[in-house]
């Protein structure tokens, strides 16, 4: 199983604000684009992917919305608005949740009040962790074994203190090339490399 974690530091956990933030400073469209490229292929979808979207602009707790591709039955269309609607619905269902609770939104989609750090600690038990870094090992030279998990961010870079805690969890820095790419572009390149070599 391949996993992708998108840490959306500026994405609001209020559904209305989320939908209003498309194309604005928070760039919530990044969530939909990354989800689209992680799960879908031409005329189908991948059945071996889980995507965790961690929304951190909140009054209480971060929200982690997880999409398990093999369990999703209907996303309502292959377009930005349909995917953002699914995310907004998960946020609406998460209202009133206390720390580290989980709710099922619909088949293949869950929402949890869990932080990025806590999520990654859990994932480190079953996945090989990778974080994007221009100075990391070129992805074409990296060995992948078992279940790889790729840690991405929105337009706000990962804080330095997060890099240190990720290193302690065994995360490896990998590079997709000399340019800084959007998370959704990283997903496409990662999938392509794994499709060829795994």
Swiss-Prot record:
Its EC number is 2.1.1.-. It is found in: Cytoplasm. GO terms for molecular function: S-adenosylmethionine-dependent methyltransferase activity; tRNA methyltransferase activity. Belongs to the methyltransferase superfamily. TrmY family. Its main location: cytoplasm. Gene3D superfamilies: 3.40.1280.10. This is Putative pseudouridine methyltransferase. Disulfide bonds: none annotated. Keywords: Cytoplasm, Methyltransferase, S-adenosyl-L-methionine, Transferase. S-adenosyl-L-methionine binds at residues 132, 186. GO terms for cellular component: cytoplasm. GO terms for biological process: tRNA methylation.
């Amino acid at each position: 199983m391949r996993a992708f974690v998108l840490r959306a530091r500026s994405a609001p956990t209020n559904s209305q604000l989320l939908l209003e933030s498309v194309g604005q400073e928070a760039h919530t469209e990044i969530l939909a684009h990354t989800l689209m490229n992680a799960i879908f292929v031409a005329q189908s979808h991948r059945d071996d992917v889980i995507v965790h979207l961690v929304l951190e602009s909140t009054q209480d707790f971060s929200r982690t919305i997880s999409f398990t591709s093999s369990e999703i039955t209907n996303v309502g269309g292959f377009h930005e608005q349909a995917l953002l609607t699914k995310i907004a619905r998960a946020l609406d269902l998460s209202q009133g949740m206390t720390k580290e609770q989980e709710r099922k939104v619909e088949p293949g989609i869950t929402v949890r009040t869990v932080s990025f750090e806590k999520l990654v600690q859990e994932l480190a038990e079953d996945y090989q962790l990778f974080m994007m870094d221009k100075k990391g090992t070129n992805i074409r030279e990296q060995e992948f074994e078992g279940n790889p998990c790729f840690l991405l961010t929105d337009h706000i870079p990962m804080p330095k203190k997060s890099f240190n805690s990720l290193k302690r969890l065994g995360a490896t820095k990998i590079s997709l090339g000399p340019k800084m790419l959007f998370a959704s572009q990283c997903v496409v390149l990662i999938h392509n490399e794994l499709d060829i070599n795994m």
